[in-house]
Regions:
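Conserved beta-strand termini and adjacent loop/short-helix elements that scaffold enzyme active sites
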Residues: 67, 120-122, 147-150
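Short beta->alpha linker loops
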Residues: 69-73, 96, 149-151, 188
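HKD (HxKxxxxD) catalytic microenvironment of the phospholipase D
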Residues: 3-6, 90, 142-197
Length: 224
């Protein structure tokens, strides 16, 4: 028995063996590479638009790294980049998305600026806004969405001449707070990110996104 005023034992310091994740569940190898030598780091908190922020994005140019005050969103960045790349396929990973941003992506698809769009969202997104999950599937295709436990926000915009990778703190919604982004025409990183998503699309049943919470939890517990 513990003394009357003794602190309870810290479970983080217990002698039990730590949980081990089988590395074989990660199909895509880790990408290791040196820090890019060509980077443009800018404070874009005074930029008036996403188009202004990515004005120096070039196919053979440097990586753009910036901070915003939330004056433009991830969907604004995607739209501005598409104005440079021309029609392209889009892949998105986000913890959440606003209906207005989903509508913007649909407008880009209908206008031909997006040729294909696939969505990786957090499993809680399905419980929070199930109507948006159904709308994404209905608007972008039956195979357009997968779920996992994720907080990663990234996107790829690819066609025959551009392979743009976007890494950001932004979800696919309007958030008037300081946000960060890293954007560049980066074939190597695009291949890696696309490989991660392709593994998920190949291994997860397409209907899991609209399954019950217990079904999703059980599947993710087994398959990760």
């Amino acid at each position: 028995m513990l003394p009357l005023f003794a602190d309870p034992p810290n479970p983080l310091l217990a002698d039990s063996a730590p949980p081990v994740v089988d590395p074989l569940v990660i199909e895509t190898p880790v990408l290791k590479r040196p820090i890019p030598s060509r980077r443009l780091i800018e404070d874009q908190r005074r930029a008036q638009s996403a188009a202004e922020a990515i004005a120096q994005l070039e196919r053979d140019g440097c990586e753009l790294i910036g901070l915003t005050r939330g004056q433009f969103s991830l969907s604004d960045l995607i739209e501005a980049i598409l104005s440079k790349t021309g029609p392209a396929a889009l892949s998105i990973s986000t913890w959440t998305a606003a209906q207005s941003s989903v509508a913007t992506m649909l407008q880009l698809l209908q206008s031909g600026k997006i040729t294909r769009c696939r969505w990786l969202v957090d499993v809680t997104f399905v419980r929070r806004v199930p109507q948006l999950v159904s709308e994404i599937r209905r608007s972008f295709g039956d195979d357009a969405i997968r779920v996992t436990r994720t907080h990663a926000k990234f996107a790829t915009i690819t066609n025959e001449t551009w392979q743009v990778a976007i890494r950001s703190s932004m979800n696919l919604n309007q958030n008037p707070r300081m946000e960060s982004y890293e954007i560049g025409n980066d074939p190597e990183l695009c291949r890696w990110l696309e490989g991660v998503l392709t593994d998920m699309w190949a291994n997860q049943p397409r209907r899991l996104a609209e399954g019950s919470h217990s079904d999703q939890t059980q599947w993710l517990r087994v398959h990760g």
